[in-house]
Amino acid sequence: MFEQNLTSEALTVTTVTSQDQITQKPLRDSVKASLKNYLAQLNGQEVSELYELVLAEVEQPLLDTIMQYTRGNQTRAATMMGINRGTLRKKLKKYGMN
């Protein structure tokens, strides 16, 4: 049986500069830069539920993309994500994607 060995390095963000230069960097670098920017804009204000905010920003497009890729097959989507189907259904409902 074929075993797929993908690492997080496969998740990259590609950008094209005004000089048509193409760059790729790991998704985690973009997330880190976005968080630093967000925190810099707080100007000392207290923030709560940052963890949930970040998860929602990543989780919703992940679910949407995987559901499109699997053509709505929840069993296959759950397997791809490494979660059980019940958990997937709860997450889809949370984001109004059921």
Curated annotation (Swiss-Prot):
**Which regions of the protein are recorded as binding DNA?**
74-93
- Bilayer-crossing regions: none
Keywords per UniProt: Activator, DNA-binding, Transcription, Transcription regulation
SUPFAM superfamilies for this protein: Homeodomain-like (SSF46689)
Please give one Pfam family short name. HTH_8
Q: Which GO terms describe its molecular function?
A: DNA-binding transcription factor activity; sequence-specific DNA binding
Q: Which domain of life is it from?
A: Bacteria
Subunit = Homodimer.
Report the sequence similarity comment from the record: Belongs to the transcriptional regulatory Fis family.
The job of this chain, per UniProt, is described as: Activates ribosomal RNA transcription. Plays a direct role in upstream activation of rRNA promoters.
What's the name of the protein? DNA-binding protein Fis
Organism of this sequence: Vibrio atlanticus (strain LGP32) (Vibrio splendidus (strain Mel32))
